[in-house]
Amino acid sequence: MESLEVANGKSSALGVSREASSPPQMGFFIAQVVLRFFTLAFTGAAIAVMVTAKETVEVFSISFTVRYSYLSAFKFLVGADAVVCGFSMLSLIFVSIFNKGKSNHYFFLYFHDLILMVLSMSACAAATAVGYVGRYGQDKAAWMAVCGNVKMFCDKALASILLSLIGFICLFLLTIMAARNLRVSGHLI
């Protein structure tokens, strides 16, 4: 009987299941660590790029300076990226320390990743909308495109938004992985 349980991946003599260290579980752990690190790196880079986005132009001998902090959507993006970056660092530490494969950890990780994903998605959407109007204008509302005058600022803002979107995609993948593990473990939400 004991040999049958060992062949099935369980060891009753030790009272320990080998399923927690099986290759699929280890693959999940590695993918999770890599995606959390990428989320941390991309949102950190997005913050750095957006905060340094500044340009001064002269119109009719009057000097104007454009900064990310003048636009509420860009401030929201930086704030959301800071929250996502910080909590990604904490979750990376949490996952590394508490890698036990317990299903209740999957639920907390799922919930954590879901909240961060929604926050990131809303900030990216707001910044993308403002960036689109800045680049192309809105003729029917008589809003002029301004990126022709502040090209460097607009390019940096675009780069920051793209980096934030990559961070969002990493969070989306983490959410799917955590939901899948909840389902596989039999602890559906």
UniProtKB/Swiss-Prot annotation:
InterPro entries: CASP/CASPL (IPR006459), CASP_dom (IPR006702), CASPL (IPR044173). Residues 1-27, 99-113, 178-189 are cytoplasmic. Keywords: Cell membrane, Membrane, Transmembrane, Transmembrane helix. Pfam families: CASP_dom. One of its GO terms (cellular component) is plasma membrane. It is found in: Cell membrane. The chain crosses the membrane at residues 28-48, 78-98, 114-134, 157-177. It is a multi-pass membrane protein. It comes from the Eukaryota. The keyword Aminoacyl-tRNA synthetase does not apply. Residues 49-77, 135-156 are extracellular. Belongs to the Casparian strip membrane proteins (CASP) family. Homodimer and heterodimers. This is CASP-like protein 1F2. It comes from Vitis vinifera.
